[in-house]
């Protein structure tokens, strides 16, 4: 019998490669907990690519069990799921094999079960969970849907997103009430769960970043870059609607203002599955935009950039891309939504801009002023290194999981 209490951690997808913010946050938390108070069993779908991921798996858990993914994410099934009482994203996560695998693991009576993302509650057994239970949320999902409705381009899309928001809010409330503790990734999200959804048992952990992995290497250069052109970078999964919306807004409203003052400036967009429509539109307009698609490591792209831009108008939770760029030494221009939930100070750790005119002006301000670029980059990195290591975040999560567990 293990001397340590057993923790069962259920992820809705295989965690490697770390190609999304959710996977990065989850693996950072698990790495921070590995070797600590718990013996950790990770449960998730099998690796989809058939590659050997044993070393990566061993870095986050003591044991790994899986199920073969049997979800149906076809366009036709997405359309049918609009008629479901569940939000589409939750309906698509339903898996008979997943439910059976989780039920078998719970039957072994671990001391704690953690479900990663609110969607994963659809895989949990009905009725009260048999052991201490923790729900790890990464966003306020219903708020994301509401913001998608706000920025939708036509009445039909707005109506669909509003319907999905209502379904998601109901699902979030019902799911969270089943857990002993709900973990949020920002005080703002925690307040929403308490005040809007009536969830009392909410705890908050900070967002962390591995400052050793994302090593500080600000781009050299003490010049005004507007003449020769600055290199901008955006990182993020390009199959996530808020990222698509943000770049479409940048294309339509702000980019022309930037290149009017700095004609040779270019943008590199680093992230999986860029929509063909967006890529084609950038080419049609002759924009100096490069879409990399999926990359193994974003660091070289951010190191090579002069400014990281985050033109988000929708989304939720906290954006790991912000901390990654700051840790690497790349100054950030962001909307309020882009840094939402992160305890950052505008004009100290990043430059804030809301409308298109201000966003373009903020980018140009950084390109023109090498001292400002250096000051913003250094202050942000120093702040992150002192306060937000993954080990600190992992230990905070561990303490929450230990509550009520006999040691």
Q: What residue spans do the PLM features occupy?
A:
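Conserved acidic donor-binding segment of nucleotide-sugar-dependent glycosyltransferases
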Residues: 350-357, 365-371
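A short, well-ordered alpha-helix in the C-terminal region of glycosyltransferases
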Residues: 372-386, 393-396
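Acidic anion/phosphate-binding donor-loop and adjacent secondary structure
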Residues: 146, 209-224, 279-280
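Acidic donor-binding loop of glycosyltransferase active sites
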Residues: 180, 300-317, 328-331
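Acceptor-binding helix/loop patch of EC 2.4 sugar-transfer enzymes
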Residues: 12, 71-91, 131-170, 227, ...
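Nucleotide-activated donor-binding/catalytic signature segment of Leloir-type glycosyltransferases, i.e.
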Residues: 262-300
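Carbohydrate-associated surface elements
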Residues: 188, 208
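Short hydrophobic beta-strand element within catalytic cores of glycosyltransferases
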Residues: 321-324, 331-335
């Amino acid at each position: 019998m293990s001397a340590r209490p057993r923790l069962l951690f259920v992820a809705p997808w295989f965690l490697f490669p770390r190609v999304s913010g959710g996977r990065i946050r989850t693996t950072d938390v698990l790495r921070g907990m590995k070797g600590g108070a718990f013996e950790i069993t990770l449960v998730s779908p099998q690796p989809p690519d058939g590659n050997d991921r044993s070393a990566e798996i061993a870095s986050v858990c003591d044991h790994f069990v899986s199920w073969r993914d049997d979800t149906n994410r076809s366009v036709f099934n997405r359309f049918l799921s609009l008629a479901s009482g569940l939000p589409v994203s939750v309906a698509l996560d339903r898996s008979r094999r997943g439910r059976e695998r989780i039920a078998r693991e719970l039957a072994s009576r671990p001391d704690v079960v953690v479900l990663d993302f609110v969607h994963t509650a659809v895989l949990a057994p009905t009725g009260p969970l048999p052991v201490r239970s923790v729900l790890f949320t990464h966003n306020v999902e219903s708020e994301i849907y509401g913001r998608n409705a706000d920025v939708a381009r036509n009445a039909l899309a707005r109506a669909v997103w509003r319907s999905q928001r209502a379904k998601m809010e109901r699902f979030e409330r019902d799911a969270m009430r089943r857990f002993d503790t709900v973990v949020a990734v920002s005080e703002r999200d925690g307040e929403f769960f308490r005040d809007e959804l009536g969830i009392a048992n909410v705890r908050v952990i900070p967002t962390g970043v591995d400052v050793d992995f994302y090593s500080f290497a600000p781009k050299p250069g003490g010049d005004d870059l507007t003449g020769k052109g600055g290199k901008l970078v955006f990182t993020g999964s390009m199959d996530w609607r808020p990222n698509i919306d943000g770049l479409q807004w940048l294309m339509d409203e702000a980019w022309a203002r930037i290149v009017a003052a700095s004609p040779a400036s270019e943008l590199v967009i680093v992230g999986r599955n860029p929509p063909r429509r967006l890529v084609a539109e950038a080419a049609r307009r002759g924009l100096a935009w490069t879409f990399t698609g999926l990359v193994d490591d974003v660091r070289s792209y951010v190191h090579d950039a002069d400014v990281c831009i985050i033109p988000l108008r929708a989304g939720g939770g906290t954006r790991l891309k912000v901390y990654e760029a700051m840790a690497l030494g790349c100054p950030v221009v962001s909307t309020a939504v882009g840094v939402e939930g992160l305890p950052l100070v505008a004009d100290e750790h990043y430059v804030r801009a809301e409308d298109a005119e201000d966003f373009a002006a903020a980018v140009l301000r950084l390109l023109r002023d090498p001292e400002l670029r250096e000051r913003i980059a250094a202050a942000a990195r120093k702040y992150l290194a002192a306060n937000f290591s993954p080990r600190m975040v992992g230990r905070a999560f561990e303490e929450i999981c230990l509550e009520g567990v006999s040691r």
